[in-house]
Amino acid sequence: QYLMYYSVPGYTDKSGIEHGWGIAVAKSTDLVNWERVGEVNADPAATYESKGFAAPCALVVGDTVHLFYQTYGNGRNDAICHAWSTDGITFTRNKTNPVFKPGGDWNCGRAIDAEVIRFKDKYFLYYATRDPEYKIQMQGVAIAPANTSFNRSDWQNMSTTAPILKPELPWEKDCIEGASVIEKNGQLYMFYAGAYNNAPQQVGVATSSDGINWERLFVEPFLTNGEPGTWNESESGHPHIFANPNGDDYLFFQGNKTNGKDW
């Protein structure tokens, strides 16, 4: 059985109480047909999540699902959090949350769109942030030792003076975000979203041998938005690359044809 974690928008309940963005869980036996089975539990004590939480990355270590996600709705103060679960549904928050936000003059201090992968006996945390003017979205990376508990003190920001990837190609416009990373034969491949949502957002690929220095594989998008009238006319974005233990790789992505009114 496979579990998928994905963002769901906020809503106002029948009592008029507003609920922020959250994370839902779906299950599948074939990676194609999915059934929603619930939502990641909110934690009233986690006041840093009071406006919502979203953009999950799930990492299985032993018999535990580790969830890395972002706070939502706090602008420059949004940061990466960590929680864990043994059933995949009910999660315990890390007491040191938020576990990461970047320093350095090149960014605004924000961190979203977490992606965590173990590589060369370290854990690499990829994140998106913006420039101090809050216009350009870029990618950074932090590392933690192999024996980490994923606490705040374990993460060392490697992007102290510059991003590891920033928009440079015409189709990337003002944004690179939503990185998802896979290892093949000792090489890392990053699938990333170029341009902001519905600009249109499309998917590119970069590669690295050390997890820090990256080079694009293609000048054009690896996965484009759809033709006019198709379901993903407005974008093909926020990718996730999944290495199935049976040997196949699956690329998940979001799309819409309503300029972001739904996904």
Where are these regions (language model features)?
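Active-site/pore-lining binding-face segments in mid-to-C-terminal subdomains
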Residues: 178
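Short tryptophan-centered beta-strand motifs in secreted/extracellular beta-sheet-rich domains
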Residues: 114
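Beta-rich carbohydrate-recognition and catalytic domains
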Residues: 1-51, 59-109, 117-174, 182-234, ...
